[in-house]
């Protein structure tokens, strides 16, 4: 967040159909005030654009890349192969195998070319946004503070959701054990 006008994170996806999932990562980045760039880049249909994007990512001021893809899902790994920035892969749910194909394509990277891989689908995109914020927070104390607040809000939501649940009342001679 040092330079508000320059994106620190890129959110890229293999197809516009991935947006319904990937917008969750953008929602998180918005919530934390992280400036980001979003774009459709296909590893298969626009490989030159993908390579140019990955090669120039650091020079363009990016600090992390969130890449979502479904099916063959080569985008995160191919970007990771062409940049030394952290790449977070989001497996997008596919029609054929419910996202298992996407997950395995992203998570099974050869040693030396890591991709931090999240869960399949919407929760994975949310966690990708949070992971990018956590990475940035190592160098931006205000983000670390916002993350603490976020975690405290999660705790409060759990406590609130527990309120309507009735507890089991034991008679004097009974125990929980």
Question: Which positions does each model-derived feature cover?
Answer:
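Short glycine/serine/threonine-rich phosphate/pyrophosphate-binding segments
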Residues: 18-22, 47, 72-78, 97-100, ...
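Glycine-rich phosphate/diphosphate-binding loop of Rossmann-like nucleotide-binding domains
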Residues: 9-37, 42-43
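Single conserved hydrophobic/aromatic residue that forms the stacking wall/gate
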Residues: 169-177
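C-terminal binding/interaction regions
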Residues: 17, 102-167
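Glycine-rich phosphate-binding loop
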Residues: 53-95
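Long, charge-patterned amphipathic alpha-helical coiled-coil/hairpin "stalk" segments used as oligomerization
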Residues: 82-116
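N-terminal beta-loop-helix "entrance" segment that forms/cooperates
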Residues: 41-57
